[in-house]
Amino acid sequence: MSVKDLYHNKWARMTFWSVLYLLWVIWLGNYWWLFGLLVIFDHHITRKVKWLFWKKDYKEGEKRNALLDWLDAIIFAVVFVTFINIFFFQAFKIPSSSMESSLLTGDHLFVSKLTLGPRIPATPLTIPFTHNVIFGKESYSTLIQNEYRRLKGFRNVERGDYVVFGFPDGDTVLTKAPADDYYTVCRFYGKDYAVKSYGPVIVRPSDKKDHYVKRCVAIHGDTLSVVNGQVYINSAAQEVWPGVQSTYTVVTDGSRINLKTLEKLGLNISELMYDDALPGYPQMPLTAAMLKEVKGCANVVSVEEQVDVYPPDYPDSYLMLFPYKESFRWTRDNYGPIWIPEAGATVKLNMENLPLYERIIRVYEKNQLDVTPEGSIIINGNVTDEYTFKQDYYFMMGDNRHNS
């Protein structure tokens, strides 16, 4: 039997689609969907119900209805692309410069959902081909909300992976300043001012947070530290990936570096400022390879990496650095150590380390957490000095380390 004969054989078509559908149901793990096999059987064999009710069956020689044909094509495209986006791969746009020079602002990525396993939509009532906004309004309804669930993928997140994820603080958004972190604005100016000036406030489901793209530098169970800009994982210096860049002060002999040289290095000329008083460039973002090229320029006198030490140049900079407490005395270049929680692991809690895990316990793992005036920690009504985590966590950094 030829392929053409198989295509026109209704039993062969029914068997083919039934096998594919059955494999999908097994992967999905929701066996109520097995009733869909009855739909496939009826559509191909018994034809008791016209499942594609919008699609007209034409008699031989009958003129086709262009409107119905377009409707059929649109419905097919919406269903097919939505299915592909949920379970297989999806296009994303780089929203910021935090990954330069590895990934540039405005770059489009096709991200595989199969690698880590696709996440089942928690908010299924969404306008197709939108994420969270359309025409300045939210593009979804929260009438139906599902629990977080991810299907099995080929592997887990590994150190060094580029990862697209929902911005952790993106559950709350100021409508007049959606690109600004609500919690950071509140820390700087107070909640009342933030809401009055930039509100109203929108609360978004977990799968409708804005997408961010970063590199995973630490996985669950790791202890992360940054010492003078060098990342350490479990006390071992981490590999510096080719795209990672820091900010340097470049002093010249009074002349500017050739523009063609700067463009060849991939630097954004419009963002580089030359200071005649230095003389040179007060801030120049460079990777290791770019640093070598700049040092080789004949008119460059010195190149010095900018390393934030404590106390920082800006006294309130801790308000932008997790865990947002001045008592930690951390900076972006001298940070930690911080232990990354993993499922099943228990951590001892006290008032000193509680800020590191408070949001995880309260928001991500949905517990009631309170602290008494005397400093006692109460979780779900019980006084405790420890907590066992339910999920694995990861630590992300942008490759553009001083602008991320």
Task: Show which residues each predicted segment covers.
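Extended hydrophobic leader/signal-anchor segments used for secretion and membrane insertion
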Residues: 1-404
